[in-house]
């Protein structure tokens, strides 16, 4: 007899109802809950899956390289990066009629999809110039992908499975990850930038055929070994340097110029190389700090145990944290996701403000798409961090081990933490909404001069301190007599000051009352999301209603007062509610970024400054005005090359709206629905020939909410993606 799905749970496999399938899918990745799972086996399975994850990433990147080389126009784009629109891939679609074939055809090619991912600018900056190089890169990544898949398989074989003690050897792991993963990889990337990318930016091709015979600097390695390192920073590219050619090119490879290359409006490659080298140096040193084989260096347990507050009135400090974190994968994952979430959000900010890739800042749609993309990813990562923090408290937290330490004390005064967050959220919410509504009311009644408009003085002061001259604050870097200004004048400051005060760059945009209001609206969203997540995690193990619910698990729903009021203590429900707040908060962030930039790019920043002070301005002058290209993508009179985005805009709305059917429901409703469907199925000719072995039962409350949430999130993001791309490329094609 064939084993029923899921093999990892005997109890589920024997369930006679359809919940066997849904619970099987839901718990497929909950490895620690599988039958016969030991701690060692759990670590080994997760370790092996990392190789699979990396293989998928490299396979995906290989696909990008391959399709651009095969169907793109990379070489034409390299010749004229500001005139040619980059092609992602061809479109072969039987639905295309004559007008669509024309609309989606560029330069006598077959219909194509335009690339808004920034890969052209990235590959160009790091030294790619021909399709053949793209093909080679693709094949290389494909081979690497295969090697990683093999490595994943190999590490599941009995002889090659690492032991549990190997996984829990924190010092060795830290040393290897810091030195190897971060340090050596940064050093390798510095090498690539210096040996391949920089010469390419100066018109010198370096490939597999000549990389050993083409030194990146005319002085070779002599200055390195003689300690005369300043030679590498002499003779810079001139301001008139034509990127990708030797015209105006210098020879320096490691610099501290500050600002941007005048032609490409991207960071100087030699500055990036210098930065990457510094990171490599710091991390390689850091990777030699922890005590392993030689009995020297730091010991993590000693460091944590030594962190006890003086005076003894603040408890046991970090005692117990070493064992707690070492033995809990959930808290490790939570910390990693939180760090990665912050890094991803910072990437979104720096990708446009300090553009690293040549000509990226001239491709407005790509810039907008990359910002939106990275902010949404950051949101999901951050919510995931808190979700795993809550699971840690349910599954892994040991009150005895953590007695009176920082974790225990945080739990003991959680009411204070939650109430303070609540007060901050209430203050922000009432004041921000009150200001917006006041402004809407006076504008509606014909007295716009009575709006309450705050000048963001503190933010302007910070911008001025960083060198922004427009506010006339004369402080720190915007003061010519300040010691900081004098100190930096010989090195990076002239380039930086030129960049920060140049109206063509995105570095510290001029701000006003509209920015002040939306900043506080975003702060409201962040604080409420944090409140929900923090409360969900701190109450995950128990609350006033249920002092300890360790055996209750993590993913039970808030189900109203009928079952004893589980809304107070459901960590899963907190995660679920926080997802909506996270999505809406990032909506405010991306709306703000996109609208402000649309007005700057269009040469009319005054539109944002005037209309962003009241809600109707946002609805009318941002959403409605910019959705016109989408609404007119196709109509009774024909279509244009935005029609696919227009259709996706509609499709996204439909997915989003479908979510509400699952969100506004309860378990009895689902049971009735499924039984009605079964009844109809069994009485319909032909359909009743098909039977299923499992008895159909309703979705659980958690499952229905998850289905609703997925529709809400996917529909929401698809809708906004289509809006950003079509509205920006429609205006700035």
Swiss-Prot record:
GO cellular component terms attached to this protein's record: chloroplast thylakoid membrane; photosystem I
Q: Which residues bind chlorophyll a B3?
A: 661, 669
Record-listed phylloquinone binding positions: 670
What catalytic activity is recorded?
A: reduced [plastocyanin] + hnu + oxidized [2Fe-2S]-[ferredoxin] = oxidized [plastocyanin] + reduced [2Fe-2S]-[ferredoxin]
Q: Which family does it belong to?
A: Belongs to the PsaA/PsaB family.
Recorded hits in HAMAP family, A to Z, give: PSI_PsaB
Q: What is this protein called?
A: Photosystem I P700 chlorophyll a apoprotein A2
Q: Which organism is it from?
A: Trieres chinensis
Report which gene this protein is encoded by: psaB
């Amino acid at each position: 007899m064939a084993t029923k799905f899921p093999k990892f749970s005997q109890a589920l496999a024997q369930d006679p109802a359809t919940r066997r399938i849904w619970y099987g899918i839901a718990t497929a990745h909950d490895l620690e809950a599988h039958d016969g799972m030991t701690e060692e086996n759990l670590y080994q399975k997760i370790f092996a899956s990392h190789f699979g994850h990396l293989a998928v990433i490299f396979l995906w990147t290989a696909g990008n390289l391959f399709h651009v080389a095969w169907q793109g126009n990379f070489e034409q784009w390299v010749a004229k990066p500001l005139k040619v629109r980059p092609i992602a891939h061809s479109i072969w679609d039987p639905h295309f009629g004559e007008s669509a074939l024309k609309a989606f055809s560029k330069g006598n090619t077959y219909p194509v999809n335009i690339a808004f991912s920034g890969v052209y600018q990235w590959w160009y900056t790091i030294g790619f110039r021909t399709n053949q190089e793209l093909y080679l890169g693709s094949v290389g990544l494909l081979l690497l992908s295969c090697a990683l898949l093999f490595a994943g398989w190999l590490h599941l074989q009995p002889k090659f499975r690492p032991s549990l003690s190997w996984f829990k050897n924190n010092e060795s792991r830290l040393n290897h990850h810091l030195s190897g993963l971060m340090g050596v990889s940064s050093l390798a990337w510095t090498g690539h930038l210096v040996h391949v990318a920089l010469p390419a930016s100066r018109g010198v091709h370096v490939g597999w055929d000549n990389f050993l015979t083409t030194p990146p600097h005319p002085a070779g390695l002599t200055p390195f070994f003689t300690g005369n390192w300043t030679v590498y920073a002499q003779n810079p590219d001139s301001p008139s340097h034509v990127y990708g050619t030797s015209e105006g090119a210098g020879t320096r490879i490691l610099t501290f110029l500050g600002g941007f290359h005048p032609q490409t409006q991207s960071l100087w490659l030699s500055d990036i190389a210098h930065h990457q080298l510094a990171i490599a140096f710091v991390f390689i040193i850091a990777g030699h700090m922890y005590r392993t084989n030689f009995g020297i260096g730091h010991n993590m347990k000693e460091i944590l145990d030594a962190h006890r507050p003086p005076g003894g009135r603040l408890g046991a400090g970090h005692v117990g944290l070493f064992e707690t974190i070492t033995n809990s994968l959930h808290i490790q994952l939570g910390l990693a996701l939180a760090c990665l979430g912050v890094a991803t959000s910072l990437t979104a900010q720096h990708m446009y403000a300090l553009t690293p890739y040549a000509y990226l800042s001239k491709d407005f749609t790509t810039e907008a798409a990359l910002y939106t993309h990275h902010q949404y990813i950051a949101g999901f990562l951050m919510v995931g961090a808190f979700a795993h923090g809550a699971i840690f408290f349910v599954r892994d937290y040991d009150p005895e081990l953590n007695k009176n330490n920082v974790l225990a004390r945080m739990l003991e005064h959680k009411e204070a933490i939650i109430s303070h967050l609540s007060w901050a959220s209430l203050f922000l919410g009432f004041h921000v909404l009150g200001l917006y509504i006041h402004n809407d009311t006076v504008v509606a009644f014909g007295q716009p001069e009575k709006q309450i408009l705050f000048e963001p003085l503190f933010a302007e002061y910070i911008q001025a301190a960083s060198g922004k001259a427009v506010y006339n604050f004369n402080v720190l870097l915007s003061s010519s007599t300040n010691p900081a200004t004098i100190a930096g004048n010989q090195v990076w400051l002239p380039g930086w000051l030129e960049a920060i005060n140049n109206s063509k760059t995105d570095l510290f945009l001029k701000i006003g009352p509209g920015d002040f209001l939306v900043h506080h609206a975003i702060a409201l969203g962040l604080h409420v999301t944090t409140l929900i997540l923090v409360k969900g995690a701190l109450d995950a193990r128990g609350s006033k209603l249920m002092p300890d619910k360790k055996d209750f698990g993590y993913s039970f729903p808030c189900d109203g007062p009928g079952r004893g009021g589980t809304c107070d203590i459901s960590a899963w429900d907190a995660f679920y509610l926080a997802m909506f707040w996270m999505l809406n908060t990032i909506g405010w962030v991306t709306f703000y970024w996109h609208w402000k930039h649309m007005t700057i790019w269009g040469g009319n920043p005054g539109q944002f400054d005037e209309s962003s002070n009241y809600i109707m301005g946002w609805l009318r002058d941002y959403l409605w005005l910019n959705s016109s290209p989408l609404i007119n993508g196709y109509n009774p009179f024909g279509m244009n090359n935005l029609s696919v985005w227009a259709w996706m805009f509609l499709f996204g709305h439909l997915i989003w709206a479908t979510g509400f059917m699952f969100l506004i429901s309860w378990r009895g409703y689902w049971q009735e629905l499924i039984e009605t469907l079964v009844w109809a199925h069994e009485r319909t000719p032909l359909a009743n020939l098909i039977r299923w072995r499992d008895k159909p039962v309703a979705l659980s409350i958690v499952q229905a909410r998850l289905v609703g949430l997925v529709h809400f999130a996917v529909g929401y993001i698809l809708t906004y993606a289509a809006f950003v791309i079509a509205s920006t490329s429609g205006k700035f094609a």
